[in-house]
Swiss-Prot record:
GO terms for cellular component: cytosol. It is found in: Cytoplasm. InterPro entries: Asp_de-COase-like_dom_sf, Asp_decarbox. It comes from Mycolicibacterium smegmatis (strain ATCC 700084 / mc(2)155) (Mycobacterium smegmatis). This is Aspartate 1-decarboxylase. Belongs to the PanD family.
Length: 136
């Protein structure tokens, strides 16, 4: 049996642009993609913390170091510049693979620059006063 587990998460990124007339997808700074181990064309889930919108799309590589998080195509109706989002990818693993699996969790600052890289998906962004630890 295979299970679908979190592979990576870019946590609390700020949307920098939205282009309704682009063909689709989400543009992500190449440095963030590398840190999260997300590759161009990979399916990603986007959760908008600000509006509650959720969608599935694919990743397009943005300029390294730019901090770009661009919502493209019809998704621009749901997610706006300035909104905070969580970008996640998932992996199918069998039981043997699951034992050693650790997600890549990338925390970013307000400019979408990397603050920390870890493996605990319940860990809040370090120093963020408005977040609760996901484990009790």
């Amino acid at each position: 049996m295979q299970r679908v587990l979190l592979a990576s998460k870019i946590h609390r990124a700020t949307v920098t642009q939205a282009d309704l007339h682009y063909v689709g997808s989400i543009t992500i700074d190449a440095e963030l993609m590398a840190a999260a181990d997300i590759v161009e064309g990979e399916q990603v889930h986007v959760v908008d913390i600000t509006s509650g919108a959720r969608l599935v799309t694919y990743a397009i590589t943005g300029t390294p170091g730019s901090g770009v998080i661009g919502i493209n195509g019809a998704a621009a109706h749901l997610i706006s510049p300035g909104n905070l989002v969580i970008i996640m990818s998932f992996v199918h693993l069998d039981e043997a693979e699951r034992a050693d699996h650790r997600a890549n969790v990338v925390h970013v600052d307000a400019d979408n620059h990397i603050v920390t890289i870890g493996s605990d998906p319940a860990q809040p962004v370090p120093g963020a006063a408005d977040q609760l630890v996901g484990r009790v």
